[in-house]
Amino acid sequence: RQRQMCIRDRGITVVRDFMREECDRLNPVFFHYITTKTPYVVMKYAMTLDGKIATKTGASKWITGEPARQEVQHMRHRYMGIMAGIGTVLADDPMLNVRVEGWKSPVRIVCDSSLRIPLDSQIVRSAKEYRTIVAYAGQEENEEITEKKEIALTEK
């Protein structure tokens, strides 16, 4: 407030909140975090006409059209991380990366409470190429879990 007065005293017009909405649209992630101290989260999902996330046969790979798939690539490029549950990983074996040449892929995050992610999944096989986090809640140790941890520790 005092700075505004000093500036005004020098004959400079001070306009508060000038083009605020336009400025907020330039970087919504930053402004959201600064004002709320919470992460900016975007949820994307696809749904069939009957409100399901897969067809009656269980197929879920292409229930969206090409424009929606292009927007997904833009979203993946724009944001810092992409998260999927283990159910999606087991059903679809996704890559969770950006497929546009020259665009940066986000950190891939898999929520997997029991560490069921297959070692031959695309996510595990490509972990050297794309930063990947698998979050799990288990306390137990077995040979498979130890192997998955070793793979994770040798990756990025």
Predicted regions and their residues:
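Short, well-ordered coil/turn segments that N-cap beta-strands
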Residues: 12, 37-39, 80
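A glycine-rich helix N-cap at a beta->alpha junction
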Residues: 11-18
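Low-complexity, intrinsically disordered short peptide segments enriched in small/polar/basic residues
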Residues: 9-11, 121
